[in-house]
Design a protein with these regions (language model features):
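N-terminal secretory signal peptides and thylakoid transit peptides that target proteins
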Residues: 1-21, 25
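The feature marks short-to-medium sequence segments in extracytoplasmic or secretory-pathway proteins
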Residues: 59-62, 72-122, 149-153, 159
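A structural detector for beta-sheet-dominated domains
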Residues: 47, 54-56, 72, 80-82, ...
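Structural beta-strand segments of beta-rich domains
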Residues: 65-67
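Surface-exposed edge beta-strand/loop patches
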Residues: 39-41, 119-174
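Short, conserved catalytic or interaction motifs in soluble domains
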Residues: 32
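C-terminal motif of bacterial Sec signal peptides marking the signal peptidase cleavage site
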Residues: 28-29
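Low-complexity, acidic Ser/Thr/Pro/Gly-rich terminal tails and inter-domain linkers that flank the onset
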Residues: 36-61
Length: 174
């Protein structure tokens, strides 16, 4: 006995297959390899092969947030204060951003490119008056702001984010 697969059956089963595939991706969850997240001590690899960045430690002493990084470049990269951002979220969901020239310093703060396969250990310091009221504190590292020699080709969708809230709340001095 044979079965003739009609056009109607084909369309019906094709639609069911499409729904099943779409549904399975919602159930498994998705992570974006271009935007990894972690906490203090985590090594993140934003951009799938651009670099490996580790936030070694984060402390706060009433007015200054200090973060120590270990960044291993896999391609030629700039590493300066424009590549870092600190996001502070308060109880009423107000977000305050510190980036570039807004109270951020980086040592070393080189405008030159670091060659591929170079290890750099920058220290980020940010002048922030009061973190005691913060509900969430995140440090963001953007390895490439734009394509080499092309300021119009932005890479700002590739970054790593560390949630440092627990580490900082443990170092706040009263």
């Amino acid at each position: 006995m044979s079965y003739t697969f009609s056009r109607r059956d084909f369309m019906k089963y094709t639609a069911l297959t499409a729904v099943a595939i779409a549904g399975s991706s919602m159930l498994t969850g998705c992570s974006n390899p271009n935007r990894p997240t972690g906490t203090v001590g985590s090594t993140l690899k934003p951009g799938d092969g651009i670099c490996e960045a580790t936030l070694k430690g984060a402390t706060y002493n009433r007015t200054t947030l200090t973060c120590n990084f270990d960044i291993y470049t896999k391609v030629s990269l700039q590493i300066n204060k424009n590549h870092f951002q600190v996001n502070v979220t308060t109880g009423d969901q107000t977000k305050i951003y510190y980036y570039g020239n807004s109270n951020i310093e980086l040592n070393p703060n080189s405008l030159k490119d670091y060659e591929a396969k170079t290890s750099v250990k920058p220290t980020l310091t940010v002048d922030i008056a009061d973190l005691a009221a913060a509900d969430k504190i995140e440090v963001v590292y953007i390895p490439k702001l734009w394509a080499k020699d092309s300021l119009t080709d932005s890479y700002s969708d590739i970054y790593g984010t560390w949630d440092i809230t627990k580490a900082i709340k443990g170092t706040i001095l009263s």
